[in-house]
């Protein structure tokens, strides 16, 4: 449970819980809205990463990594996946938040949750599109450092980030 102590913030209480297969439809719908909303922030088109709008992909991801849902009350407002790579290294993937819940500090809470939920992980990795300045700012503010760029699908550049904990 992550509680917000700021009484001025309209998101008073956010819970982060493991996602289950019955959440796949809701997660796919929120993911679709979140990634397609990025067109307002520089995305070259209305789309997202492979499988972003597929309930089947969401269920498969639950088997490949630790998939979490973000809840406000009983409403799923986002999700993210932690892919453990080994005992001390993990990748944070597919962080997405419902458009009407964005810019409220939830992303920062997700990053803090991941680090606290996986205390053995000392090396975090993630990536974000080069056009998404909002997520770049979030990750850099949280201590992530740019380490490279890739263009895996030939569509746009992803900026790779890492964070090493002491």
Set out the residue ranges of the language-model regions.
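Conserved N-terminal entry element of GNAT/NAT acetyltransferase domains
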Residues: 1-22, 165-166
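Conserved acetyl-CoA-binding loop-helix of GNAT-fold acetyltransferases
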Residues: 97, 103-116, 137-141
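Conserved GNAT-fold acetyl-CoA-binding loop/helix
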Residues: 15, 29-57
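Conserved beta-strand in the GNAT
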Residues: 69, 75-84, 91-96
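A short, internal acetyl-CoA/4′-phosphopantetheine-binding micro-motif in the GNAT/acyltransferase core
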Residues: 95-102, 128-130
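A short helix-loop-beta-strand connector motif used in the catalytic cores of GNAT acetyltransferases and
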Residues: 55-69
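A conserved beta-turn-beta hairpin within the catalytic core of GNAT-like acetyltransferases
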Residues: 84-93, 102, 120-122, 153-157
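Conserved GNAT acetyl-CoA-binding A-motif
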Residues: 117-129
């Amino acid at each position: 449970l992550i509680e917000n102590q700021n009484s001025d913030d309209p998101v008073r209480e956010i819970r982060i819980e493991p996602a289950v297969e019955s959440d796949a439809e809701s997660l796919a719908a929120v993911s679709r809205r979140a990634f397609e909303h990025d067109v307002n922030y520089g995305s070259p088109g209305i789309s997202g990463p492979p499988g972003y709008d597929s309930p089947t992909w969401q269920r498969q991801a639950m088997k490949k990594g630790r998939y979490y849902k973000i809840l406000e009350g009983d409403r799923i407002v986002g999700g993210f996946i932690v892919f453990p790579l080994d005992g001390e290294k993990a990748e944070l993937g597919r962080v997405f938040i419902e458009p009407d819940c964005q810019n409220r500090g939830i992303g920062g809470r997700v990053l803090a949750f991941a680090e606290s939920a996986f205390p053995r992980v000392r090396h975090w990795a993630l990536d974000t599109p080069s056009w998404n300045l909002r997520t770049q700012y979030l990750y850099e503010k949280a201590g992530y450092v740019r380490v490279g760029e890739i263009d895996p699908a030939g569509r746009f550049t992803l900026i790779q980030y890492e964070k090493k904990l002491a």
